[in-house]
């Protein structure tokens, strides 16, 4: 509690001055042997896509599945004996929960994680598997956060904030040290922004080691709290957030992280939901890597970079995503790319019509993956049926060729998606 009180008495300028590259190097020592050094992966596909030489930093392959372990472990490892005996607490429904639980277990410290009661059971079980006591409360993160503060006050736990903490952001900054050590002539680093702790640490470390390297933050359009804060000149709050990048679904950045990002970031790029989903699909197809929505933000921003021919490190921040969610995101990305096409046609209710449609599709190399033959959907004619067909396609041009071929065969095509 003394540390929190002391920090509250300091100005933002004093906090900025009191957090340096030395803290990041100290964090690297603390993390040695605890985190994996996730080696860069050169990506010919993403390089060709954006006209730069792209290297992936796969923190989705990190212990616990994200970068969050770096900050959590660095923070908890520097608690004194009395603080560790008291135990630690936080609120999270995602990667921070697992990072804190993993770090606390490794350091023989009790951890309590407050999660919304609506948290998917797989995430709850994963957090418990690292030894944490999980408290399920409320329907939202805000409810769980309020509960964690109540328990902290009642039990005397040490709070481990997910982003607005100097030791946490110093731990996250070790990611940048690894990038620069492996790719010494890197020109730019792309880093996702949620609450801003990751971007703060990466930017601080990068600019201290090589001020010429550009550090570009990436936010989802539906949760661009840091961009809004930059535009308004102070920490600002979004009225709501809506994004598939749930790890970055933050309404308000931290005051510390706002100050660090304002000082060290060169630019913020925002990306759409479809750009995020398309990046996820490309990562799976081209690199056989799975990321969560927030993990794909850097890749989604590659086409928006204001330069060409540079060496760019894109950080894949995490890969904790459940199977049903990744399946839904892949389906939407395939539809957006014209790789899946669903349509309906009305047919006379007589033999041979389905064969006729199937022959047209076969001639156009369209692979049928779903078909529904329904008599009840036609209300204006007793002698007609509706045929709904979903096919695999090769892109938007292929879809148009299929539509034209069906129309030439006498069918009226209604595109569903």
Language model regions located:
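PLP-dependent amino-acid enzyme catalytic core
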Residues: 2-417
């Amino acid at each position: 509690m003394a540390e929190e009180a002391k920090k509250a008495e300091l100005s933002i300028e004093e906090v900025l001055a009191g957090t340096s590259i030395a803290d990041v190097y100290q964090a690297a020592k603390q993390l040695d042997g605890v985190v994996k050094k996730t080696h860069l992966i050169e990506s010919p596909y993403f390089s060709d896509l954006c006209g730069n030489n792209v290297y992936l930093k796969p923190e989705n392959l990190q212990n616990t599945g994200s970068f969050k372990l770096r900050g959590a472990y660095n923070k908890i490892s520097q608690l004194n004996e009395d603080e560790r005996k008291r135990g630690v607490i936080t609120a999270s429904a995602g990667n921070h929960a697992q990072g804190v639980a993993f770090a606390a277990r490794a350091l023989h410290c009790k951890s309590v994680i407050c999660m919304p009661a609506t948290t998917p059971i797989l995430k709850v079980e994963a957090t418990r598997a690292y030894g944490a006591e999980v408290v399920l409360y409320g329907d939202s993160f805000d409810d769980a956060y309020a509960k964690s503060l109540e328990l902290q006050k009642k039990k005397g736990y040490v709070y481990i904030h997910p982003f607005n903490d100097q030791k946490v952001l110093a731990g996250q900054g070790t990611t940048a040290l690894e990038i620069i050590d492996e790719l010494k002539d890197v020109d730019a680093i792309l880093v996702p922004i949620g609450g801003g702790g990751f971007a703060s640490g990466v930017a601080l470390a990068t600019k201290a080691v090589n001020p010429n390297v550009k550090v570009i933050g990436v936010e989802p359009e539906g949760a661009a709290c840091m961009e809004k804060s930059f535009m308004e000149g102070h920490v600002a709050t979004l009225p709501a957030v809506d994004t598939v990048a749930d790890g970055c679904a933050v309404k308000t950045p931290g005051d510390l992280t706002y100050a660090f990002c304002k000082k060290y970031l060169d630019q913020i790029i925002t990306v759409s939901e479809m750009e995020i989903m398309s990046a996820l699909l490309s990562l799976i197809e081209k690199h056989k890597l799975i990321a969560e929505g927030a993990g794909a933000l850097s890749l989604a921003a590659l086409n928006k970079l204001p330069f060409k021919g540079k060496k760019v490190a894109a950080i894949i921040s995490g890969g904790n995503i459940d199977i049903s969610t990744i399946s839904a995101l892949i389906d939407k990305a395939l539809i957006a790319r014209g790789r899946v096409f669903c349509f309906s046609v009305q047919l006379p209710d007589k033999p041979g019509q389905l064969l006729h449609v199937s022959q047209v599709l076969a001639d156009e190399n369209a692979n049928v993956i779903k078909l529904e033959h329904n008599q009840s959907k036609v209300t204006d004619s007793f002698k007609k049926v509706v045929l709904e067909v979903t096919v695999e396609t090769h892109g938007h041009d292929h879809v148009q060729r299929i539509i034209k071929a069906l129309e030439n065969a006498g069918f009226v095509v209604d595109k569903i998606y």
